[in-house]
């Protein structure tokens, strides 16, 4: 439903385990304001490999996303930043904090301590599972075999294409684990969509 709010009306869904439950529930997508079509992975093809099963991609740009996410990402801003920066691909990112339980020393080239931080927390930008891609780059996906988003991003970089990150400023949660799914159910009434 969220995608259709941003004018994304043709959605392809890759199915595998218990996929018929999804297709039986959403059918052709008309109840949620879009046109849904389904492809079925006979064997696992990775997080991006199933794209090769889709026969007709008619748009110049493609959004790929993991299906086990709850987010209120602003897709319009995501697209505008992608265009403004002249990107070939954008990956939506989320901050991931890594607390270090000890003091961390920073050394110079002579191995003298030049500074230290007591129990710092480092923040990294992590893959948020949402990608905006120029259709022409889909040729980098092999026709057979498992191919993950990380493989694809490496192929994009190795090919000299422009890959940018887009920090998600709103809500994002991977609901693939039972505890996180329960959290999403508690949070959903308080999220601005």
Task: Describe the predicted segments one by one.
Residues 22, 54, 68, 82, ...:
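Residue-level signal for inorganic ion chemistry
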Residues 85-95:
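A short, conserved acidic/glycine-rich loop-to-beta-strand motif
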Residues 1-67, 77, 144:
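Conserved N-terminal catalytic core of the sugar/cofactor nucleotidyltransferase
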Residues 104-107, 165:
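A structural signal for short hydrophobic beta-strand segments in well-ordered beta-sheet cores
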Residues 8, 59, 86-87, 160-161:
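Short, high-confidence coil segments that cap the C-terminus of an alpha-helix
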Residues 63, 70, 76-83, 97-99, ...:
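Catalytic-core segments of class I nucleotidyltransferases/pyrophosphorylases
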Residues 28-32, 106-108, 155-157:
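Short, conserved catalytic or adaptor-binding loops enriched in Gly and charged residues
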